[in-house]
Design a protein with these regions (language model features):
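Conserved nucleotidyltransferase catalytic core and NTase-mimicking acidic/glycine-rich helix/loop elements
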Residues: 132-303, 308-310
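Secondary-structure junction/capping motif
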Residues: 1-6, 105-106, 221, 237
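Hydrophobic, Leu/Ile/Phe/Ala-enriched alpha-helical segments that form helix-helix packing faces
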Residues: 15-23, 74, 78-82, 269, ...
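N-terminal regions immediately upstream of nucleotidyltransferase
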Residues: 1-17
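Basic, alpha-helical terminal appendages of large translation-related enzymes
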Residues: 1-2, 66-72, 262
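Conserved NTP/Mg2+-binding pocket subregion across the NTase superfamily
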Residues: 68-188
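Active-site nucleotide-donor binding segment shared across nucleotidyl transfer reactions
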Residues: 19-65
Length: 311
Protein backbone atom coordinates (compact mmCIF):
# COMPACT_ATOMS: atom_id res chain seq x y z
CA UNK A 1 0.00 0.00 0.00
CA UNK A 2 1.31 3.43 -0.98
CA UNK A 3 1.88 6.02 1.72
CA UNK A 4 -0.85 8.34 0.45
CA UNK A 5 -3.44 5.57 0.58
CA UNK A 6 -2.16 4.48 4.00
CA UNK A 7 -2.53 8.04 5.24
CA UNK A 8 -6.09 8.40 3.97
CA UNK A 9 -7.15 5.06 5.44
CA UNK A 10 -5.55 5.88 8.79
CA UNK A 11 -7.45 9.17 8.86
CA UNK A 12 -10.75 7.60 7.80
CA UNK A 13 -10.40 4.69 10.24
CA UNK A 14 -9.24 6.57 13.33
CA UNK A 15 -8.67 10.26 12.70
CA UNK A 16 -12.09 11.31 11.45
CA UNK A 17 -13.95 9.82 14.42
CA UNK A 18 -11.42 11.23 16.90
CA UNK A 19 -11.87 14.75 15.55
CA UNK A 20 -15.66 14.44 15.36
CA UNK A 21 -16.03 13.12 18.90
CA UNK A 22 -13.39 15.19 20.71
CA UNK A 23 -13.33 18.42 18.71
CA UNK A 24 -16.81 18.88 17.18
CA UNK A 25 -16.63 22.69 17.43
CA UNK A 26 -13.29 22.71 15.59
CA UNK A 27 -13.87 19.98 13.02
CA UNK A 28 -15.09 22.21 10.20
CA UNK A 29 -12.18 24.63 10.66
CA UNK A 30 -9.47 22.03 9.98
CA UNK A 31 -7.88 20.86 6.75
CA UNK A 32 -6.82 17.22 6.68
CA UNK A 33 -4.45 15.62 4.19
CA UNK A 34 -0.96 14.50 3.32
CA UNK A 35 1.15 17.24 1.75
CA UNK A 36 4.81 18.20 1.90
CA UNK A 37 8.17 16.46 2.02
CA UNK A 38 8.67 12.77 1.38
CA UNK A 39 8.25 10.50 -1.62
CA UNK A 40 4.85 9.34 -0.35
CA UNK A 41 3.46 12.86 -0.85
CA UNK A 42 4.30 12.58 -4.55
CA UNK A 43 3.16 8.96 -4.82
CA UNK A 44 6.72 7.82 -5.54
CA UNK A 45 7.29 5.66 -2.46
CA UNK A 46 8.13 1.97 -2.71
CA UNK A 47 9.38 -0.77 -0.39
CA UNK A 48 12.78 0.90 -0.11
CA UNK A 49 11.12 4.13 1.01
CA UNK A 50 9.92 2.44 4.18
CA UNK A 51 13.40 2.31 5.70
CA UNK A 52 13.10 5.88 7.03
CA UNK A 53 10.49 8.51 7.92
CA UNK A 54 7.60 6.26 6.82
CA UNK A 55 4.52 5.79 8.96
CA UNK A 56 0.73 5.84 8.99
CA UNK A 57 -0.08 9.46 9.65
CA UNK A 58 -1.80 12.54 8.32
CA UNK A 59 -1.58 16.31 8.64
CA UNK A 60 -4.07 18.34 10.65
CA UNK A 61 -3.75 21.88 9.33
CA UNK A 62 -5.19 24.33 11.85
CA UNK A 63 -5.97 28.07 11.58
CA UNK A 64 -3.09 30.34 12.55
CA UNK A 65 -5.16 31.97 15.29
CA UNK A 66 -5.88 28.71 17.14
CA UNK A 67 -5.32 29.08 20.88
CA UNK A 68 -2.36 27.21 22.34
CA UNK A 69 -4.50 25.14 24.71
CA UNK A 70 -6.66 23.73 21.91
CA UNK A 71 -3.59 23.13 19.77
CA UNK A 72 -2.01 21.16 22.61
CA UNK A 73 -5.18 19.11 23.10
CA UNK A 74 -5.24 18.28 19.39
CA UNK A 75 -1.60 17.22 19.50
CA UNK A 76 -2.26 14.92 22.47
CA UNK A 77 -5.31 13.37 20.82
CA UNK A 78 -3.36 12.74 17.61
CA UNK A 79 -0.48 11.20 19.55
CA UNK A 80 -2.90 8.76 21.22
CA UNK A 81 -4.08 7.27 17.93
CA UNK A 82 -3.06 3.60 17.41
CA UNK A 83 0.69 3.04 17.25
CA UNK A 84 0.41 0.62 14.34
CA UNK A 85 -1.84 0.43 11.29
CA UNK A 86 -1.94 -2.05 8.41
CA UNK A 87 1.26 -3.60 9.72
CA UNK A 88 3.17 -0.30 9.72
CA UNK A 89 4.35 1.26 12.99
CA UNK A 90 4.16 4.96 13.70
CA UNK A 91 7.44 6.75 14.27
CA UNK A 92 8.59 7.13 17.86
CA UNK A 93 11.02 9.93 16.99
CA UNK A 94 10.34 12.86 14.67
CA UNK A 95 12.46 12.87 11.49
CA UNK A 96 15.18 15.44 10.93
CA UNK A 97 13.54 18.78 10.23
CA UNK A 98 10.53 18.08 12.45
CA UNK A 99 7.40 16.01 12.22
CA UNK A 100 5.74 15.78 8.82
CA UNK A 101 2.41 14.70 10.30
CA UNK A 102 0.11 15.79 13.08
CA UNK A 103 -0.97 19.29 14.04
CA UNK A 104 0.51 22.06 11.86
CA UNK A 105 -0.57 25.67 11.58
CA UNK A 106 -1.55 26.43 8.00
CA UNK A 107 0.67 29.51 7.85
CA UNK A 108 3.62 27.67 9.37
CA UNK A 109 3.38 24.94 6.73
CA UNK A 110 3.38 27.32 3.78
CA UNK A 111 6.02 29.57 5.33
CA UNK A 112 8.41 26.63 5.68
CA UNK A 113 7.89 25.57 2.07
CA UNK A 114 7.62 28.90 0.25
CA UNK A 115 8.61 31.73 2.58
CA UNK A 116 5.03 33.03 2.63
CA UNK A 117 2.20 32.21 5.03
CA UNK A 118 -0.71 33.21 2.81
CA UNK A 119 0.46 33.12 -0.81
CA UNK A 120 2.68 35.35 -2.92
CA UNK A 121 1.82 38.99 -3.47
CA UNK A 122 4.86 40.01 -5.51
CA UNK A 123 6.67 38.88 -8.64
CA UNK A 124 9.94 38.80 -6.69
CA UNK A 125 8.57 36.03 -4.47
CA UNK A 126 7.64 33.95 -7.50
CA UNK A 127 11.01 34.53 -9.12
CA UNK A 128 13.10 33.58 -6.09
CA UNK A 129 11.23 30.50 -4.87
CA UNK A 130 12.54 27.22 -6.33
CA UNK A 131 9.99 25.16 -8.23
CA UNK A 132 10.90 22.16 -6.06
CA UNK A 133 9.65 24.07 -3.01
CA UNK A 134 6.39 24.91 -4.75
CA UNK A 135 6.07 21.25 -5.74
CA UNK A 136 6.39 20.21 -2.09
CA UNK A 137 3.83 22.82 -1.05
CA UNK A 138 1.21 21.64 -3.53
CA UNK A 139 1.67 17.87 -3.83
CA UNK A 140 -0.18 15.06 -2.10
CA UNK A 141 -3.87 15.23 -1.37
CA UNK A 142 -6.25 17.21 0.80
CA UNK A 143 -8.81 14.82 2.28
CA UNK A 144 -11.04 17.45 3.85
CA UNK A 145 -11.10 21.24 4.06
CA UNK A 146 -14.50 22.64 5.00
CA UNK A 147 -13.15 26.11 5.73
CA UNK A 148 -11.26 26.16 2.45
CA UNK A 149 -8.40 28.42 3.56
CA UNK A 150 -5.67 25.80 3.22
CA UNK A 151 -6.93 24.86 -0.25
CA UNK A 152 -7.23 28.52 -1.28
CA UNK A 153 -3.57 29.15 -0.51
CA UNK A 154 -2.64 25.84 -2.14
CA UNK A 155 -4.41 26.84 -5.35
CA UNK A 156 -2.76 30.25 -5.35
CA UNK A 157 0.64 28.54 -5.41
CA UNK A 158 -0.48 26.24 -8.22
CA UNK A 159 -1.42 29.23 -10.38
CA UNK A 160 1.99 30.52 -11.48
CA UNK A 161 1.56 33.86 -13.27
CA UNK A 162 2.12 33.59 -17.02
CA UNK A 163 4.81 36.27 -17.03
CA UNK A 164 6.79 34.34 -14.40
CA UNK A 165 6.38 31.13 -16.35
CA UNK A 166 7.68 32.82 -19.49
CA UNK A 167 10.67 34.37 -17.71
CA UNK A 168 11.69 31.07 -16.19
CA UNK A 169 11.12 29.28 -19.49
CA UNK A 170 13.26 31.80 -21.38
CA UNK A 171 16.08 31.39 -18.86
CA UNK A 172 16.07 27.61 -19.03
CA UNK A 173 15.96 27.66 -22.83
CA UNK A 174 18.98 29.92 -23.16
CA UNK A 175 20.93 27.89 -20.60
CA UNK A 176 20.05 24.68 -22.45
CA UNK A 177 21.23 26.25 -25.71
CA UNK A 178 24.49 27.41 -24.17
CA UNK A 179 25.30 24.06 -22.58
CA UNK A 180 23.97 21.58 -25.14
CA UNK A 181 24.03 23.26 -28.52
CA UNK A 182 27.31 25.12 -28.00
CA UNK A 183 29.55 24.16 -25.07
CA UNK A 184 29.16 20.38 -25.33
CA UNK A 185 30.65 20.31 -28.82
CA UNK A 186 33.31 22.88 -27.87
CA UNK A 187 34.43 20.72 -24.95
CA UNK A 188 34.57 17.63 -27.15
CA UNK A 189 36.69 19.53 -29.70
CA UNK A 190 39.11 20.52 -26.93
CA UNK A 191 39.31 16.95 -25.65
CA UNK A 192 37.65 17.98 -22.38
CA UNK A 193 35.41 14.95 -21.93
CA UNK A 194 34.72 15.79 -18.30
CA UNK A 195 33.71 19.31 -19.22
CA UNK A 196 31.59 17.90 -22.02
CA UNK A 197 29.74 15.69 -19.57
CA UNK A 198 29.12 18.61 -17.23
CA UNK A 199 27.79 20.57 -20.21
CA UNK A 200 25.46 17.70 -21.07
CA UNK A 201 24.23 17.51 -17.49
CA UNK A 202 23.55 21.26 -17.59
CA UNK A 203 21.68 20.83 -20.86
CA UNK A 204 19.53 18.02 -19.49
CA UNK A 205 18.87 19.93 -16.28
CA UNK A 206 17.65 23.09 -18.01
CA UNK A 207 15.86 21.35 -20.87
CA UNK A 208 13.97 19.19 -18.38
CA UNK A 209 12.97 22.29 -16.43
CA UNK A 210 11.71 23.80 -19.68
CA UNK A 211 9.60 20.71 -20.31
CA UNK A 212 8.01 20.99 -16.86
CA UNK A 213 7.19 24.64 -17.52
CA UNK A 214 5.67 23.76 -20.88
CA UNK A 215 3.43 21.34 -18.97
CA UNK A 216 2.63 23.95 -16.29
CA UNK A 217 3.94 21.58 -13.63
CA UNK A 218 6.46 22.17 -10.87
CA UNK A 219 9.61 20.14 -11.15
CA UNK A 220 10.24 18.33 -7.85
CA UNK A 221 13.51 17.72 -5.98
CA UNK A 222 16.14 16.36 -8.36
CA UNK A 223 15.97 12.73 -7.26
CA UNK A 224 12.33 12.58 -8.37
CA UNK A 225 12.70 14.68 -11.54
CA UNK A 226 12.87 11.76 -13.98
CA UNK A 227 10.01 9.94 -12.27
CA UNK A 228 7.87 13.07 -12.42
CA UNK A 229 8.80 13.80 -16.02
CA UNK A 230 7.61 10.39 -17.16
CA UNK A 231 4.14 11.32 -15.90
CA UNK A 232 3.88 14.59 -17.82
CA UNK A 233 1.36 15.00 -20.61
CA UNK A 234 3.76 16.64 -23.06
CA UNK A 235 7.28 15.45 -24.00
CA UNK A 236 7.37 12.82 -21.26
CA UNK A 237 9.07 10.43 -23.67
CA UNK A 238 12.22 12.54 -23.46
CA UNK A 239 12.96 11.31 -19.94
CA UNK A 240 14.75 8.19 -21.19
CA UNK A 241 16.66 10.28 -23.73
CA UNK A 242 17.88 12.69 -21.07
CA UNK A 243 18.91 9.75 -18.93
CA UNK A 244 21.00 8.38 -21.80
CA UNK A 245 22.65 11.74 -22.42
CA UNK A 246 23.90 12.12 -18.86
CA UNK A 247 24.86 8.49 -18.25
CA UNK A 248 26.69 7.59 -21.48
CA UNK A 249 30.36 8.09 -22.33
CA UNK A 250 31.87 10.76 -24.56
CA UNK A 251 33.93 8.63 -26.90
CA UNK A 252 33.92 10.11 -30.43
CA UNK A 253 31.09 8.00 -31.86
CA UNK A 254 28.89 8.43 -28.80
CA UNK A 255 29.63 12.14 -28.49
CA UNK A 256 28.64 12.70 -32.12
CA UNK A 257 25.38 10.84 -31.56
CA UNK A 258 24.70 12.84 -28.41
CA UNK A 259 25.20 16.12 -30.26
CA UNK A 260 22.60 14.99 -32.81
CA UNK A 261 20.21 13.97 -30.03
CA UNK A 262 20.54 17.42 -28.47
CA UNK A 263 19.36 18.95 -31.75
CA UNK A 264 16.46 16.49 -31.91
CA UNK A 265 15.40 17.45 -28.39
CA UNK A 266 15.70 21.13 -29.25
CA UNK A 267 13.47 20.57 -32.27
CA UNK A 268 10.82 18.85 -30.16
CA UNK A 269 10.86 21.61 -27.56
CA UNK A 270 10.62 24.25 -30.29
CA UNK A 271 7.63 22.44 -31.81
CA UNK A 272 5.88 22.56 -28.44
CA UNK A 273 6.74 26.25 -28.04
CA UNK A 274 5.12 26.87 -31.42
CA UNK A 275 2.04 24.82 -30.50
CA UNK A 276 1.59 27.02 -27.45
CA UNK A 277 2.24 30.20 -29.49
CA UNK A 278 5.19 31.11 -27.29
CA UNK A 279 7.75 31.88 -30.01
CA UNK A 280 8.01 33.63 -33.36
CA UNK A 281 11.56 32.52 -34.11
CA UNK A 282 12.04 30.29 -37.14
CA UNK A 283 15.18 28.25 -36.52
CA UNK A 284 16.62 25.38 -34.50
CA UNK A 285 18.58 27.59 -32.10
CA UNK A 286 17.06 27.47 -28.61
CA UNK A 287 18.75 30.78 -27.74
CA UNK A 288 16.77 32.69 -30.35
CA UNK A 289 13.56 31.05 -29.14
CA UNK A 290 14.48 32.02 -25.58
CA UNK A 291 14.53 35.69 -26.55
CA UNK A 292 11.29 35.30 -28.46
CA UNK A 293 9.64 33.78 -25.38
CA UNK A 294 11.01 36.63 -23.27
CA UNK A 295 9.51 39.18 -25.69
CA UNK A 296 6.04 37.85 -24.83
CA UNK A 297 6.28 38.92 -21.19
CA UNK A 298 3.72 41.68 -20.62
CA UNK A 299 5.40 43.26 -17.58
CA UNK A 300 8.05 45.72 -18.75
CA UNK A 301 9.93 45.35 -15.48
CA UNK A 302 10.11 41.56 -15.78
CA UNK A 303 10.71 41.52 -19.53
CA UNK A 304 13.71 43.85 -19.25
CA UNK A 305 15.36 41.88 -16.46
CA UNK A 306 18.34 39.76 -17.49
CA UNK A 307 17.06 36.80 -19.46
CA UNK A 308 18.57 34.41 -16.92
CA UNK A 309 16.90 36.13 -13.96
CA UNK A 310 14.47 33.24 -13.53
CA UNK A 311 16.99 30.40 -13.29
Amino acid sequence: MKGLELSRKFYETYGASMLHEKFPELEDKLAIGLVGDGSECFGYDDDISRDHDFEPGFCIFVPDDIDSRTEFQLERAYAKLPKSFEGVDRLKISPVGGSRHGVIKTGDFYLAKTGSRTGFDSIDQWMTTPDSCLAAATNGEVFRDDLGEFSRIRQSFLDMPQDVRLKKLAGHLIMAAQAGQYNFKRCISHGETGGAQLAMIEFADHAMSAVFLLNRKYRPFYKWAFRAMRELEKLSGLADTFEFLISSDNEPVTASAKADIVEDIASMIITELQKQSLTDAICGDLEKHAYSVNDRISSTQLRTMHIMAGV
